[in-house]
């Protein structure tokens, strides 16, 4: 069974919708965009309560998504938020649509960071995930960097060099 709450029709705000979802014991909670501190805070609470929370953030890559969540909170709470994230965050997927060289439809670029038990405890509360997924061990776990995807698309002549430079995260 699917129960959907539409903001403006079924709920006044994301916050009100999330509070109602928590009271109704939903298994999965989908948030189209986490735009304020209250929504982010409730999403973390829902994840801590065992709900699968899927949320969208307007960021350029997976690491930026994590940073945006942490930076929503005041400085004095950021250490605690990093700790909470390290306990509940299963992974982050960031997507971008890149223009194809042939002028056809766009193609997808992804940045994937998956947590595992070794990554989940931040060192002194500073990092939830490693900054890069170029490390071969991380790639074996299913992590994918946007730069690697962009490079592969360029090498396969799907995108041109200007597009590759534009979408590369760490430069060329």
Regions found by a protein language model. Give the residues of each.
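Short, flexible helix-loop junctions that flank or precede catalytic/ligand sites
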Residues: 1-172
